[in-house]
């Protein structure tokens, strides 16, 4: 039985894949009774790998890959891991695939985009039932996680992948997942695009590895080359959704994509548990009246989303505190998506906070701002980096969590200088105020 996304899945609800169960049973291969419960898994896989000679009739590399894929899926794709009929692709595809959380976000985004492309009244309608006449084309199918989520609100959905083995894996899993309206196509994405007449939404997750197998973060180094194909993509689809590396400079990506005109409509910076996972860029042609929708930036961290117009933020001035922070004030660190967006002036407009300095990326307030999108702390002490002052505020403190913002030392160097172990309930922020003075802020988490 497969639980719906969002349902709680306990450890015992992750059965080994059926192929693994059958292979272990047939060849009398025994696993530790605690297998699947944590740290023993890696060493046990190594043990199995070294026992290949004992099981000549077993495709041990495939067996090990299925177990490793299932292990990854338990954290990344729990709904899939709970389905024993799912089969897993090679390690690289598992590493690159989206998590359920980020794939689910793309489903919600696609449903909203459908409302404008097809005239559906609201996104909840597109989420609850298939939109007639709609077509999704995923030109970079991969393991098919994103496709399996996004396709749910489309009448037809086409998965395109150039690796035949991945097509076979996807075809099997889509049937297991009950996706009856999908078509799997083994083809080169560019050639398929040339033959395509029209789609409601084209989705791409370009490969971010160069010919040597190393990772790349430049949009024009990815495969397929979105920059080269951009005009044709816009001709063939109402809307195009592009997933890019979280390491990419989104400002540069927008400039490169807008070289053919004002086509970038939205940039989504998506984080999970405060770790930036991906960038999503939405491009589309101007409306029939020739008006281009203003570019919007959406910063997402788990269930929290901050949206703003790029032009709105561009004209804002960041508010900076008139005097250095003091004990009793509250300190705020924006979440990762907001940090990547760079919309620091916007934060001082929307929330009752002010920056320690324009380059500090830290904010303070007199009273607690409970809805600030990030981490919140209470400042318990402040000092300069005068040795006597530092000794005073660190008296009795043996370990602390350290962060540096607009400060000329790394965390490692500062920790060594302060002679503090890592961890504990104390948080230290080293920064520079508006007068150029270096400060050490001692905080506790709120």
Language model segments and positions:
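SAM-dependent transferase fold signal centered on methyltransferase-like domains
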Residues: 1-446
